[in-house]
């Protein structure tokens, strides 16, 4: 799972934020935890709270799904076994990172590495900023498995639970684990990046966690993962396209192979939400509205390298400029999910459900309109150093 820029949550002042009204029908009484804050002084904060995220985390809400909804997910276990697990590949049929990298046991290893590095020389620094950002996001996989295991009704209760939900989470994690491994090894061999700074960023990110605002609620959680897997599919697809344009066909193959995995995972998560719309259209459309009013925060939004408190914003700006992941992509994903789940054709909804339906169906056009206005006002971005590429300057 990866990703990036959100047109409505970036620190850029381009677009306004939408206010979220209180939604009640899907919610049980909330348990609220104090928000996590970081001082504006990074030096002071580093001394006081060295393991805190680089920016404020939202007020934490937990276990918002009413207990009676838990039975829905229990009743779906047979369905999940037949319809979800089919989107996993047996390990023996899966690709492995070594399939795409020089073989250190092979006599021609050093020559293969030289060839890889020669190809990498043709790629611009800005491309490596985006590729490193994608890799770091993939490497924070422990956080994403943790997030899935916070969801009521579907978590792995023991660490080796035999339920289809738990099997999916573990096997999905195992498949995703290859993505960060492959990109990490490629970047190490390329010689183009400061691996110690990259590794520090990974450690900071895993230590900071993520703040998806899914409230232990699988309705919100699976809507979030549906969105994220499609965003990752788009992002890796675009890094593959750019690698090919710069003449590195093997790197394009690496990124394209990861893209295919993300597409398969997207299909699985969207099927879960599709089933929820079939069983509980009212609750699901309200959850969809809530997730979109909150605005989908990207998994790596707490990214930090020990220097740049706005690292994720800067990385996202480069991804936007290169067309790797953009505000348009965000709107396109939302429009795709509205169509995939047939939200416009839902009937029999309450007044609250109809309002939620109207909101999510109108939102893609609204986002596009806001982005068009923002582009019209946009000024040329500054050039800043990125520690990942030895502090070389890249335009935002």
Swiss-Prot record:
One of its GO terms (biological process) is fatty acid biosynthetic process. Binds 2 Fe(2+) ions per subunit. The keyword Oxidoreductase applies. Its cofactor is Fe(2+). The keyword Kinase does not apply. Its EC number is 1.14.19.-. It is found in: Plastid, Chloroplast; Plastid. Fe cation 2 binds at residues 176, 229, 262, 265. It holds the Pfam family FA_desaturase_2. It comes from the Eukaryota. Keywords: Chloroplast, Fatty acid biosynthesis, Fatty acid metabolism, Iron, Lipid biosynthesis, Lipid metabolism, Metal-binding, Oxidoreductase, Plastid, Transit peptide. GO terms for cellular component: chloroplast. Its main location: plastid. InterPro entries: FADS-2_CS, Fatty_acid_desaturase-2, Ferritin-like_SF, RNR-like. CDD domains: Acyl_ACP_Desat (cd01050). Fe cation 1 binds at residues 138, 176, 179, 262. Belongs to the fatty acid desaturase type 2 family. Homodimer. This is Acyl-[acyl-carrier-protein] desaturase, chloroplastic.
């Amino acid at each position: 799972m990866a990703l990036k820029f959100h047109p409505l949550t970036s620190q850029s002042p381009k677009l306004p934020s939408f206010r979220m009204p209180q939604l009640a029908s899907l919610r049980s009484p909330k348990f609220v935890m104090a928000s996590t804050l970081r001082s504006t002084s990074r030096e002071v904060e580093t001394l006081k709270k060295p393991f805190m995220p680089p920016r404020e985390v939202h007020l934490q809400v937990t276990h918002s799904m009413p207990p009676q909804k838990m039975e829905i997910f229990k009743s779906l276990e047979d369905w999940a076994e037949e319809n979800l697990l089919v989107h996993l590949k047996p390990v023996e049929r899966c690709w492995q990172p070594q399939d795409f990298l020089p073989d250190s046991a092979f006599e021609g290893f050093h020559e293969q590495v030289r060839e890889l590095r020669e190809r990498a020389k043709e790629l611009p620094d800005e491309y490596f900023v985006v590729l490193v950002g994608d890799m770091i996001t993939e490497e924070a996989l422990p956080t994403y498995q943790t997030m899935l295991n916070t969801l009521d009704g579907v978590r792995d209760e023991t660490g080796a639970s035999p339920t289809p939900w738990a099997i999916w989470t573990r096997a999905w994690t195992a498949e995703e684990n290859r993505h960060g491994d492959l990109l990490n090894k490629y970047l190490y061999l390329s010689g183009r990046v400061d691996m110690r700074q990259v590794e520090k960023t990974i450690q900071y990110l895993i230590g900071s966690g993520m703040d998806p605002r899914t409230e232990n609620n699988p309705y919100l959680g699976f809507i979030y993962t549906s969105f994220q897997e499609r965003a990752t599919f788009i992002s890796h697809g675009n890094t593959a396209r750019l690698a090919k344009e710069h003449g590195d066909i093997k790197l394009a193959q690496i990124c394209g192979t990861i893209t295919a995995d993300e597409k398969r995972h997207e299909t699985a998560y969207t099927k879960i939400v599709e089933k929820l719309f079939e069983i509980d259209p009212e609750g699901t459309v309200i959850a969809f509205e809530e997730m979109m009013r909150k605005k989908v925060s990207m998994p790596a939004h707490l990214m930090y390298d020990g220097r740049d408190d706005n690292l994720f914003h800067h990385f996202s700006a480069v991804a936007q400029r290169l067309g790797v992941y953009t505000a348009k992509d965000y709107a396109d994903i939302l429009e795709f999910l509205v169509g995939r789940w047939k939200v416009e054709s839902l009937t029999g909804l309450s007044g609250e459900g109809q309002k939620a339906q109207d909101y999510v169906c109108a939102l893609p056009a609204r986002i596009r309109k806001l982005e068009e206005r923002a582009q019209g006002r946009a000024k040329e971005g500054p050039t800043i150093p990125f520690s990942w590429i030895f502090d070389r300057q890249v335009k935002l």
